[in-house]
């Protein structure tokens, strides 16, 4: 829990280039974690912004020519300055444009964390996926039958890229190729509002600013799931969204320790 306390104390600046659909919620979840968001995306300023930030997040949702240019500039700046960065592979399972771009970004910017659902992770690894738009396809969902083979694929992707891989879903799998963790927190409501995956990427960006990449990623993923569970009895999706941010802001270490469901593989 030292990472949480460090973030709250230091309030690191987090540069997050995301989509207009979820940008407000992403900024607020970063604030709730104790960090400071900046959402700059103009190609002429992003290098300067990234260079003074403590971490970078890039999100492939709702991409544009300018945003693609900006993310690559920021990613290279982060890599050159040893600033931790995470890429969210939104939609690479259904869009060749995004898939080709993600491969280029990973090759040239070497992100510390690659995050996506199982359809997106399979696509970036080069395996045919059954993505349903930006959502995971039914055939790609992790089951008891495909659990081991999916874990091995995630580990290989991590070793080949040098990145921590975070495969999110009903069960979350996070690996750096050597250590692999399975997190079973979360609730259905998290999939019933738009932007929770984007918010998680902002949270990962916040916690990896501590430079403890694997632990920061694990903490972010577990916290999102736990806060979802704490919020799931809300009246509806609107109040759930608000309670999710409230719980992220107020959750104690004791509750995290009590609620977390994590196993090593």
Curated annotation (Swiss-Prot):
<keyword id="KW-0479">Metal-binding</keyword>
<dbReference type="Pfam" id="PF02110">
    <property type="entry name" value="HK"/>
</dbReference>
<dbReference type="GO" id="GO:0005524">
    <property type="term" value="F:ATP binding"/>
</dbReference>
<dbReference type="GO" id="GO:0009228">
    <property type="term" value="P:thiamine biosynthetic process"/>
</dbReference>
<dbReference type="InterPro" id="IPR029056">
    <property type="entry name" value="Ribokinase-like"/>
</dbReference>
<dbReference type="GO" id="GO:0000287">
    <property type="term" value="F:magnesium ion binding"/>
</dbReference>
<dbReference type="InterPro" id="IPR000417">
    <property type="entry name" value="Hyethyz_kinase"/>
</dbReference>
<feature type="binding site">
    <location>
        <position position="195"/>
    </location>
    <ligand>
        <name>substrate</name>
    </ligand>
</feature>
<feature type="binding site">
    <location>
        <position position="115"/>
    </location>
    <ligand>
        <name>ATP</name>
    </ligand>
</feature>
<keyword id="KW-0418">Kinase</keyword>
<keyword id="KW-0808">Transferase</keyword>
<keyword id="KW-0067">ATP-binding</keyword>
<keyword id="KW-0784">Thiamine biosynthesis</keyword>
<dbReference type="GO" id="GO:0009229">
    <property type="term" value="P:thiamine diphosphate biosynthetic process"/>
</dbReference>
<keyword id="KW-0460">Magnesium</keyword>
<comment type="pathway">
    <text>Cofactor biosynthesis; thiamine diphosphate biosynthesis; 4-methyl-5-(2-phosphoethyl)-thiazole from 5-(2-hydroxyethyl)-4-methylthiazole: step 1/1.</text>
</comment>
<protein>
    <recommendedName>
        <fullName>Hydroxyethylthiazole kinase 2</fullName>
        <ecNumber>2.7.1.50</ecNumber>
    </recommendedName>
</protein>
<comment type="function">
    <text>Catalyzes the phosphorylation of the hydroxyl group of 4-methyl-5-beta-hydroxyethylthiazole (THZ).</text>
</comment>
<feature type="binding site">
    <location>
        <position position="39"/>
    </location>
    <ligand>
        <name>substrate</name>
    </ligand>
</feature>
<comment type="similarity">
    <text>Belongs to the Thz kinase family.</text>
</comment>
<dbReference type="GO" id="GO:0004417">
    <property type="term" value="F:hydroxyethylthiazole kinase activity"/>
</dbReference>
<keyword id="KW-0547">Nucleotide-binding</keyword>
<feature type="binding site">
    <location>
        <position position="168"/>
    </location>
    <ligand>
        <name>ATP</name>
    </ligand>
</feature>
């Amino acid at each position: 829990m030292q990472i949480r306390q460090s973030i709250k104390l230091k309030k690191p600046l987090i540069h997050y280039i995301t989509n207009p659909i979820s940008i407000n919620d992403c900024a607020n979840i970063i604030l709730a974690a104790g960090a400071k968001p900046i959402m700059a995306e103009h190609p002429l300023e992003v290098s300067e912004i990234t260079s003074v930030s403590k971490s970078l997040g890039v999100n492939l949702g709702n991409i544009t020519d300018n945003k693609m240019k900006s993310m690559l500039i920021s990613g290279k700046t982060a890599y050159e300055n040893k600033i931790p960065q995470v890429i969210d592979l939104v939609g690479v399972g259904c869009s060749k444009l995004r898939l080709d771009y993600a491969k280029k970004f990973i090759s040239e910017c070497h992100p510390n964390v690659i995050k996506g659902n199982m359809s997106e992770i399979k696509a970036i690894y080069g395996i045919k996926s059954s993505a349903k738009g930006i959502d995971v396809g039914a055939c790609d969902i992790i089951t008891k039958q495909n659990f081991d083979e999916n874990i091995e694929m995630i580990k290989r992707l991590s070793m080949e890229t040098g990145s921590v891989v975070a495969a999110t879903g009903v069960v979350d799998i996070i690996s750096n190729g050597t250590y692999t963790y399975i997190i079973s927190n979360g609730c259905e409501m998290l999939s019933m509002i738009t932007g929770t995956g984007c918010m998680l990427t902002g949270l990962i960006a916040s916690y990896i600013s501590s430079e403890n990449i694997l632990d920061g990623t694990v903490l972010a993923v577990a916290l999102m799931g736990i806060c979802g569970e704490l919020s799931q009895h809300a009246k509806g999706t609107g109040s759930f969204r608000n309670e999710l941010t409230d719980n992220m802001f107020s959750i104690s270490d004791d509750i995290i320790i009590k609620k977390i469901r994590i196993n090593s593989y």
